[in-house]
Amino acid sequence: MAAGHGHEHGHEHGHGHGKMELPDYRQWKIEGTPLETVQKKLAARGLRDPWARNEAWRYMGGFAGNITFPSVILKGFKWGFAAFVVALGAEYFLDSQNGDKKHH
């Protein structure tokens, strides 16, 4: 195969694949999270978890909310109820259209 016709590794082919930008690792802090307690307990035994920071994202931002039984049960209720109302309206509308045809 001639040069430039195959999929050579390391070259961009215009598909929008560029270098992926990773977030700065220093933004993730374990201070004030349950991971800090784990690190302290490990330190008391002379140990340390060097990868704890990789789990810190779980305790920050939108991921940090408490999970409760009602939140699990009601998750998606708003969109589910909206879909139910749309389906009910469509069913009512289609039934009324068919009802008109039956009487004529």
From Swiss-Prot:
Sequence positions bearing Pros-methylhistidine: H11, H13, H15
Ranges annotated as spanning the membrane: 72-90
Keywords: Acetylation, Electron transport, Membrane, Methylation, Mitochondrion, Mitochondrion inner membrane, Respiratory chain, Transmembrane, Transmembrane helix, Transport
Subunit (UniProt): Complex I is composed of 45 different subunits.
Record family assignment: Belongs to the complex I NDUFB3 subunit family.
Post-translational modification: Methylation at His residues by METTL9 enhances complex I-mediated mitochondrial respiration.
Residue span of region Disordered: 1-20
Residue(s) carrying N6-acetyllysine: K29, K40
High-level lineage: Eukaryota, Metazoa, Chordata, Craniata, Vertebrata
GO biological process, one term: electron transport chain
Function statement: Accessory subunit of the mitochondrial membrane respiratory chain NADH dehydrogenase (Complex I), that is believed not to be involved in catalysis. Complex I functions in the transfer of electrons from NADH to the respiratory chain. The immediate electron acceptor for the enzyme is believed to be ubiquinone.
Modified residues (N-acetylalanine): A2
Naturally occurring in which organism (per UniProt): Mus musculus
Chain's gene name: Ndufb3
Localization per Swiss-Prot or TrEMBL: Mitochondrion inner membrane
PTM annotation (N6-succinyllysine): residues: K29, K40
One Pfam family named in its UniProt record: NDUF_B12
Any one annotated GO CC term: mitochondrial inner membrane
Topology relative to the membrane: Single-pass membrane protein
Protein name: NADH dehydrogenase [ubiquinone] 1 beta subcomplex subunit 3
